[in-house]
């Protein structure tokens, strides 16, 4: 992998998959900001989607497409400059948790054996 943002993301996922091939990994895209950098954010999101497609059990949490735009108006209530304030972190945590819940409920067989990952235990009903 090249020494680029995406190359290094690939290295990280490869390393995690080397440690535990059955690990479930969630990759999160950035939120749009409602300004000129949104084009770059959309590009990053599309490349991260490709990265997820390269690995088993690697899921995209596409905040670029599905989260509110983190624009100046939103930062008035939920931000401290660029980063969220405590209320913003709480709201973001709820978004991520709900998105993960959606992914799990949409792929129940892929998550049914989670308690056994990293062990020699198996559930005969699942492969």
Language model regions located:
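Oxyanion-hole/transition-state-stabilizing segment in secreted/luminal serine hydrolases
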Residues: 1-6, 31-33
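Amphipathic, non-transmembrane alpha-helical secondary structure
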Residues: 3-10, 14, 90, 94-97
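Active-site segments of SGNH/GDSL-like serine hydrolases
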Residues: 12-45
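Catalytic His-Asp segment of secreted/periplasmic serine-dependent ester chemistry enzymes
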Residues: 32-127
């Amino acid at each position: 992998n090249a020494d680029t943002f995406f190359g290094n993301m690939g290295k990280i996922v490869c390393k995690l998959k080397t440690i535990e091939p059955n690990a479930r990994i969630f990759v999160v895209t950035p939120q749009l900001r409602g300004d000129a950098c949104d084009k770059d954010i959309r590009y990053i999101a599309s490349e991260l989607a490709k990265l997820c497609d390269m690995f088993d059990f690697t899921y995209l949490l596409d905040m670029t497409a599905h989260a509110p735009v983190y624009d100046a108006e939103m930062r008035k209530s939920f931000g401290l400059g660029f980063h969220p304030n405590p209320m913003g972190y709480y709201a973001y945590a709820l978004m991520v948790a709900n998105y993960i819940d959606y992914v799990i409920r949409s792929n129940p067989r892929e998550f049914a054996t989670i308690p056994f990952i990293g062990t020699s235990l198996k559930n005969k009903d699942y492969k």
